């Protein structure tokens, strides 16, 4: 960041924090002057969009921090009093304090272990704090909620400043560099869960939401589908407007991920998600932040092939990407839950598994925010998936619940797992906790997950073998259906390990969801009606009118000889009618436009 910050937040000991005081007019003025200097320095040499807008990365990874000077303390305490409606007794109950007023609260009473604060990091609650809803949990929730508001207010204010400085400025700050929903495990300072960052809300105050992602899932495994999830988040945060997709290619220490998912495949994944531009990061540096220039020739050849293919294909994708399935983004988990609280990344893997399952069936999958659902976006979708969200009750979700209820009544379908508070509140789904057991389906299922429940209503589609209770239920509401799974279906589908058949079942043949001849979702949802060929697990399809982008995430070539195409643009050479492994192709198909 620029060395002149105007005004910095202060530590409790009176020392500067080492970053911007984002709400300070002085700090904001230094940012304006910095951008003014760049505009003057580069002049006509600056890159512009086709409409003449100047593309400007107005900020790199903003991280709001509190300030413990007089003004900063007053600001936070005023916010805290407003949040609690002036009810100090409610705050005392949560924080286990005996304060008589908000104004007398001390920093160590209202901020979580403030001695651990620095310009990038902070203290975080433990898993026990989350499980027991301790005072430290509530301090954390309040701290992060406040900082999220600071960031959004900052972006809104700076948008006005940028417009005054240069009306043709295209405002595209880089909001996060280490992935958004999937962060590198073990790198606690770079996780979204302590950044107070909700990019869907930030999107209201910028021209384009941008963050850098990588093909790395929550278990620290190279995974192209995790990158596809991040791309879907970018697309939907930007409301399907043209957007730039970030890709962190200078990554090596996380298992040398680009030896498993090559750059061309990553670029194809972003293009399939609708990206109109690429922000490639990590060419050179002193640590894992930039080692791309040291990569071998195979890596560079793949990058070159991906870039050339994208340059040819992106201009052809002028029609909107098809919308079919919506996954509800677990905003509360993303905002509040540190990685170390999410054991083995299983909450995030549950969303990934749902995304994989529907993508493997050829569906086009979007990831939508509760505010977007409340605003009416579900009218464009056939199915809604609700992944695990253990912090759902922390959100303001009344409008979301009404929208979901209306969606189902109008004919939409909902898929969800256990402990789904949204399904309980909006759809009156009732469940009871039961001991782990296997499920009688067309085949017998060993459920992967961390808890199992039985449902008390609806039609039983699958039953627990021992108790006979309902494991998979179908509930009809109006013209729509709710499909309830008594185990974490997405997490189960994302597994790459084989569970052991419970000993009391002897040598009976049982399998996890991912190894079934036909999964429950495949039986209930079927394949996308727009799919021009039989689905292939690990192959992603994206329709843009009469253009079809296919990305092969598998290690073997895929037979596409059955597709009738007027024109094709392949990333890498392959035998006629075949799509190479870990590569993409764009086809102009001989079918009417699909919008």
Regions found by a protein language model. Give the residues of each.
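Polysaccharide-binding and catalytic clefts of secreted carbohydrate-active enzymes
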Residues: 4, 8-226
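Conserved beta-strand positions
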Residues: 58-59, 211, 280, 367, ...
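A conserved amphipathic helix/loop scaffold
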Residues: 388-595
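Hydrophobic targeting/anchoring helices
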Residues: 8-16, 172-353, 461-463, 473, ...
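Mature N-terminal, pre-catalytic/accessory segment of carbohydrate-active enzymes
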Residues: 1, 13-49, 54-55, 161, ...
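A short helix->loop->beta-strand "cap" motif at the edges of active sites that frequently abuts
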Residues: 167-169, 238-241, 409-413, 480
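A short, well-structured beta->alpha microelement
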Residues: 197-198, 356-377
């Amino acid at each position: 960041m620029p060395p002149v910050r105007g005004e910095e937040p202060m530590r409790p000991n009176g020392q500067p924090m080492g970053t911007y005081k984002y709400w300070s007019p002085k700090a904001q003025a230094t940012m304006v002057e910095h951008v003014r200097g760049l505009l003057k320095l580069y002049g006509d040499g600056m890159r512009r969009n086709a409409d003449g807008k100047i593309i400007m990365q107005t900020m790199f990874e903003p991280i709001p921090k509190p300030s413990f000077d007089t003004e900063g303390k007053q600001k936070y305490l005023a916010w805290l009093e407003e949040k609690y409606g002036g009810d100090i007794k409610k705050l005392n109950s949560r924080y286990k304090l005996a304060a008589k007023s908000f104004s007398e609260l001390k920093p160590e009473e209202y901020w979580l272990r403030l001695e651990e604060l620095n310009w990038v990091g902070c203290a975080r609650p433990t898993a026990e704090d989350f499980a027991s809803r301790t005072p430290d949990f509530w301090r954390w929730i309040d701290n992060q909620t406040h900082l999220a508001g600071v960031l959004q207010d900052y972006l809104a204010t700076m948008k006005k400043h940028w417009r005054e400085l240069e009306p043709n400025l295209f405002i595209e700050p880089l909001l996060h560099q280490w992935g958004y929903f999937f962060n590198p495990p073990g790198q606690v300072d770079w996780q979204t869960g302590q950044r107070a960052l909700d990019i869907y809300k930030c999107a209201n105050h910028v021209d384009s939401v941008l963050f850098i992602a990588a093909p790395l899932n929550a278990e620290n495994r190279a995974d192209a589908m995790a990158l596809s999830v991040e791309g879907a988040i970018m697309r939907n945060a930007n409301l399907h407007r043209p957007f730039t997709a970030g890709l962190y290619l200078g990554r090596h220490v996380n298992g040398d991920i680009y030896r498993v998912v090559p750059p061309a495949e990553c670029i194809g994944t972003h293009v399939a998600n609708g990206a109109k531009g690429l922000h490639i990061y990590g060419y050179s540096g002193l640590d894992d932040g930039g080692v791309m220039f040291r990569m071998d020739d195979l890596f560079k050849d793949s990058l070159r092939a991906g870039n050339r293919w994208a340059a040819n294909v992106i201009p052809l994708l002028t029609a909107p990407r098809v919308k079919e399935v919506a996954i509800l983004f677990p905003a509360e988990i993303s905002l509040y839950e540190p990685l170390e609280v999410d054991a083995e990344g299983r909450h995030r893997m549950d969303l990934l598994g749902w995304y994989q399952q529907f993508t493997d069936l050829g569906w086009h999958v979007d990831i939508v925010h509760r505010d977007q659902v409340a605003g009416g976006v579900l009218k464009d979708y056939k199915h809604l998936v609700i992944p695990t969200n253990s912090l759902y009750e922390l959100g303001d979700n009344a409008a979301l619940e009404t929208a979901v209820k209306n969606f189902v009544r109008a004919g939409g379908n909902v898929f969800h797992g256990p402990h789904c508070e949204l399904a309980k509140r909006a759809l009156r789904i009732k469940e009871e906790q039961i001991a782990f057991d296997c499920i009688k389906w067309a085949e017998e299922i060993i459920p992967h997950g961390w808890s199992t429940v039985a449902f008390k209503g609806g039609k039983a589609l699958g039953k627990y073998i021992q108790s006979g209770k309902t494991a998979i239920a179908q509930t009809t509401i109006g013209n729509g259906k709710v499909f309830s799974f008594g185990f974490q279906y997405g997490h189960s589908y994302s597994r790459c390990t084989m569970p052991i058949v419970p000993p009391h079942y002897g040598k009976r043949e049982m399998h996890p969801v991912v190894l079934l001849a036909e999964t429950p979702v495949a039986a209930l949802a079927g394949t996308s009606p727009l799919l021009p060929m039989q689905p292939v697990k690990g192959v992603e399809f994206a329709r843009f009118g009469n253009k079809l982008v296919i990305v092969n995430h598998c290690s073997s070539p895929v037979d596409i000889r059955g597709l009738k195409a007027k024109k094709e643009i392949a990333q890498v050479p392959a035998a006629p009618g075949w799509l190479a492994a870990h590569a993409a192709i764009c086809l102009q198909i001989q079918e009417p436009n699909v919008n």
